[in-house]
């Protein structure tokens, strides 16, 4: 890797560590020419399928949009940022790992709901109310009853 300070074409790795859930590598490098040290991060470049919206439009998968959806649902909830990032990574991995050229937006929505159900039930209900376009209290009741059943099944 080229040194960002002196542009020397050769640098050496001083230290390597896995970060996150082992999906990124942090490397400390040193330039033998100028002696400067710098940090690099390596992560796999995932190829995501196109997202097919409910009206038939197709758009590129957007990890930032996914992250924003999680953050909106989890706003003012006691969930660690690391837990949210891990959930985002799991959804991204499922989307890219399917090996499909296209994925329906509702499939991604279901992945998000599965993650939110485990992270925070209030956020799950918030997300479900928007995602499934609740129009009455009965829809909320059905989701809450489903949550209670899921909890009983886990016990």
Swiss-Prot record:
Gene Ontology biological process terms from the UniProt entry: negative regulation of DNA-templated transcription
Keyword tags: ATP-binding, DNA-binding, Metal-binding, Nucleotide-binding, Repressor, Transcription, Transcription regulation, Zinc, Zinc-finger
Keyword Transcription regulation among record annotations: yes
UniProt superkingdom: Bacteria
PROSITE patterns in alphabetical order: ATP_CONE
Any matching Pfam family: ATP-cone
Protein's UniProt keywords contain Zinc: yes
Cofactor note as given: Binds 1 zinc ion.
Zinc finger intervals, unnamed: 3-34
GO molecular function: ATP binding; DNA binding; zinc ion binding
Named cofactor requirement(s): Zn(2+)
Domain ATP-cone as annotated: residue spans: 49-139
InterPro entries: ATP-cone_dom, NrdR-like_N, RNR_NrdR-like
Task of the protein: Negatively regulates transcription of bacterial ribonucleotide reductase nrd genes and operons by binding to NrdR-boxes.
Similarity comment text for this entry: Belongs to the NrdR family.
PANTHER family, sorted: TRANSCRIPTIONAL REPRESSOR NRDR
Record-given protein name: Transcriptional repressor NrdR
Organism name: Halorhodospira halophila (strain DSM 244 / SL1) (Ectothiorhodospira halophila (strain DSM 244 / SL1))
């Amino acid at each position: 890797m080229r040194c960002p300070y002196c542009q020397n074409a050769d640098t050496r790795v001083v230290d390597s560590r896995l970060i996150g859930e082992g999906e990124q590598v942090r490397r400390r490098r040193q330039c033998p020419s100028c002696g400067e040290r710098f940090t690099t991060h390596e992560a796999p470049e995932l190829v995501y399928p196109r997202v097919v919206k409910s009206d038939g439009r197709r758009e590129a998968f957007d990890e930032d949009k996914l992250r924003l959806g999680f953050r909106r649902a989890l706003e003012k909830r006691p969930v660690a940022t690391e837990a949210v990032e891990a959930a985002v990574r799991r959804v991204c991995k499922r989307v890219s790992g399917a090996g499909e050229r296209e994925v329906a937006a509702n499939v991604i929505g279901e992945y998000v709901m599965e993650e939110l159900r485990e992270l925070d039930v209030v956020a799950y209900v918030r997300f479900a109310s928007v995602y499934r376009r609740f129009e009455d209290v009965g829809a909320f009741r059905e989701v809450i009853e489903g949550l209670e059943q899921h909890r009983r099944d886990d016990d």
